[in-house]
Amino acid sequence: MEKEENKMEKIISLAKRRGFIYPGSEIYGGLAGTWDYGPLGVALKNNIKKLWWKKFVSERDDMYGIDAAILMNPKVWEASGHLSGFSDPLGKARFNLMFKTQVGAGEEASPSYLRPETAQGMFVNFKNIIDSFHPKLPFGLAQIGKAFRNEIAPRDFLFRAREFEQMEVEYFVEKESWQTYFEEWKKEVEEWMEEIGL
């Protein structure tokens, strides 16, 4: 394990020296689990997002791109089970990983949450897409966006951060054909990852 940690430290050090990524708020002591992308990191990240969008949205006739809000009505998170089940163990208790915030001021303020994933934004807009574009199954919704998780112990560089970006597709199919489409998507994603050198 020590060898793996040493390797990760070397990768982080190289990425910082070369201008890819820096610890967030570093000149003020940092904030665990937050990272700032430097000039080369931003360029790399934007190129990956552009290639992903081209492959999985622009070049397909069955995909609709959206950009859903980061803040959503708390009922969304209640209905999806995030309020009761999106947690990590903390001793004998459970710790909800969602960042809680307030919308509005003073006594009029109401609770809200920073989204912990992008999927729910696509699900709540499903009917809007149906009403606007009338797609037939199969079709998908795609989104690239920020997500936030109040990690108990952020670690492993970018792999367990408090703020991160996701590139996500929700693909809707007839129940009996899910396995066929799952295998097709799995193959497409593997091919794309190979194309970009992962």
At which residue positions do the language-model features occur?
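TRNA-recognition modules of translation machinery and tRNA-sensing kinases, especially anticodon-binding
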Residues: 2-198
